[in-house]
């Protein structure tokens, strides 16, 4: 199986699958397949393909193209390192990489890259030929400039290599270390290799094993010491890396029982291993054991909050599968209060809906939230807290958080603006707009964008940073049910039918919108001009929905006239008219 980012299977997996397919084919079938493949080869690849086969009168297969081993290879590696140390590649370290406003772009390879690529390819030939001692010696020598630096002690970067499959190369090197180290020293040597290599964070024993057809030898004897070594190692900068390797080793060594032992052993790995333990039991169909494991992990001393919340998530799912909805609600509430996230709020709502206790549960959680921030002396809830308050019908508290917040910085995940403002417009009009209903509908639909789940801040609906490509709404995946916008629409339906309150919400929304537009335009945040224009049109659309057509057009005219010297903003403002349910009057 190909690893993430890899173009195909590892060598061992590939050769095993290839041999399996060969065995079922006759000579004629094999010749036909090779002939068909040869017919489709590009011109530049034909001679290399032909050279694979022994020509008439030849005694043996030729040496693989470009292979130069032994003293010659080590001499070329030494010469390469000397050039690096002497600074012959100085000035080309960045390889032409530059920031183009959207990401890092490269114009050409660094000068050292072709030389390094050739050397790594030749070492790969040595590895494939089975001389792991020579391959290890060569790898260790060539990797020195990448690990300890060259000119001015700046290390070369493996990620700049283009034709070399770096993850496979690293796995091959570790395989060499494993097989050429005496058994009593193997754990320390392999662990040192994992910790030193730049790519060790994405490496696993399974990937090391897959570099050859034969599995890693003596793995059963290696694993107990490997687990102890991982537990006592101090070089892992990330708990996730440690947990990943421990989970793999435990699964290989003793399955769920080994995972349970690790989860009960104090250390920073406990929570992550505990979650893996629960998942392994669930995948194996041992649901009652998985439930017991989740209950144990939730209250296990020393486990961090995020992992206890994950255990509560899994417990709620298992309880729901058993039909115990009341206990499932309790588990969802435990997960939410332990480590609040948008996903947990939605999961809580979904479980409560199924149990028929949504309104009272939201009210209880909102009470707890308001008590917590009042007793702590904080100024008010963040975006996630406001989402809970809106679902519970606590508009006054959410509005206070919105009006107290800065008119800028909406790209921060804690800012209440991207959720509370569209909700206020929807509440003022009495109904949630459809996604295609002008700017108002789009801003409301954007509520479902969870900042914690977006890879780039530029994709956030409230982004007011440097100019960037606008989010492509058509490429967004459909959010899972229940959606926050759907739940908020239900909450709007539960609000009191008070015309005075609706008018007040509209006035507040207009004031917040105007303040944000002013902050963006006067601050010359050009990347957010289009979003500022969208706010103006959204407010006008809300006015129109409430039967205030004249006020809607007057509002648009006033906003445009307010910034006579900001031609870039006025251009975005005029362009926004094409996406609105309204049209600005001629000025």
Question: How would you name each of these model-derived features?
Answer:
Residues 1-587:
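Eukaryote-biased, non-catalytic alpha-solenoid scaffold regions
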């Amino acid at each position: 199986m190909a690893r993430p980012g890899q173009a195909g299977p590892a060598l061992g997996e590939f050769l095993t699958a290839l041999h399996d397919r060969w065995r079922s084919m006759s000579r004629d079938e094999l010749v036909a397949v090779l002939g068909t493949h040869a017919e489709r080869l590009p011109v530049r690849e034909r001679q290399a393909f032909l050279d694979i086969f022994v020509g008439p009168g030849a005694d043996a297969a030729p040496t693989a193209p470009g292979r130069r081993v032994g003293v010659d290879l080590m001499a070329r590696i030494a010469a390469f390192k000397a050039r690096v140390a002497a600074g012959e590649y100085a000035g080309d370290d960045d390889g032409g990489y530059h920031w183009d406003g959207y990401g890092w772009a490269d114009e050409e390879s660094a000068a050292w890259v072709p030389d390094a690529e050739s050397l790594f390819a030749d070492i790969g030939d040595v590895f494939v030929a089975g001389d792991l001692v020579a391959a290890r010696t060569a790898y260790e020598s060539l990797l020195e400039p990448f690990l300890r630096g060259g000119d001015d002690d700046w290390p070369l970067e493996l990620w700049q290599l283009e034709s070399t499959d770096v993850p496979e190369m690293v796995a091959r090197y570790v395989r060499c270390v494993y097989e050429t180290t005496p058994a009593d020293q193997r754990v320390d040597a392999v662990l040192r290799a994992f910790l030193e290599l730049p790519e060790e964070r994405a490496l696993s024993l399974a990937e090391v094993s897959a570099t050859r057809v034969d599995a890693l030898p003596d793995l059963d004897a290696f694993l107990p010491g490997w687990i102890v070594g991982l537990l006592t190692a101090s070089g892992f900068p990330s708990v996730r890396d440690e947990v990943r390797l421990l989970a793999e080793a435990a699964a290989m060594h003793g399955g769920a029982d080994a995972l349970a032992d690790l989860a009960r052993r104090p250390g920073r790995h406990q929570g992550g291993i505990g979650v893996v333990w629960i998942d392994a039991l669930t995948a194996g169909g041992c649901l009652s054991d998985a439930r017991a494991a989740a209950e144990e992990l939730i209250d296990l001393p020393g486990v961090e909050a995020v992992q206890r919340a994950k255990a509560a998530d899994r417990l709620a799912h298992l309880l729901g599968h058993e039909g115990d909805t009341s206990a499932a609600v309790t588990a969802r509430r435990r997960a939410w209060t332990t480590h609040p996230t948008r996903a947990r709020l939605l999961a809580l709502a979904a479980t409560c809906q199924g149990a028929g206790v949504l309104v009272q549960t939201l009210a209880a959680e909102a009470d707890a939230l308001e008590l917590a921030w009042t007793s702590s002396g904080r100024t008010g809830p963040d975006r996630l807290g406001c989402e809970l308050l809106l679902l519970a019908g606590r508009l006054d508290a959410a509005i206070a958080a919105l009006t107290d917040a800065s008119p800028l910085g909406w790209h921060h995940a804690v800012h209440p603006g991207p959720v509370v403002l569209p909700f206020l417009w929807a509440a003022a009009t009495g109904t949630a707009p459809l996604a295609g209903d002008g700017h108002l509908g789009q801003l409301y639909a954007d509520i479902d964008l969870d900042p914690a789940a977006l890879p780039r801040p530029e994709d956030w609906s409230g982004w007011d940073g440097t100019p960037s490509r606008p989010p492509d709404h058509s490429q967004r995946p459909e959010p899972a049910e229940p959606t926050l916008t759907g739940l908020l629409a239900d909450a709007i339906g539960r609000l009191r039918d008070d015309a005075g309150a609706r008018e007040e919400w509209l006035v507040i929304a207009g004031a917040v919108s105007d303040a944000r537009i002013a902050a963006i335009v006067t601050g010359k945040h050009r990347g957010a001009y289009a979003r500022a224009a969208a706010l103006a049109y959204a407010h006008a659309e809300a006015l129109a929905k409430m039967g205030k057509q004249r006020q809607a057009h007057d509002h648009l005219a006033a906003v445009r006239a307010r910034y006579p010297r900001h031609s870039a903003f006025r251009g975005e403002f005029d362009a926004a008219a094409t996406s609105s349910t309204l049209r600005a009057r001629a000025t």
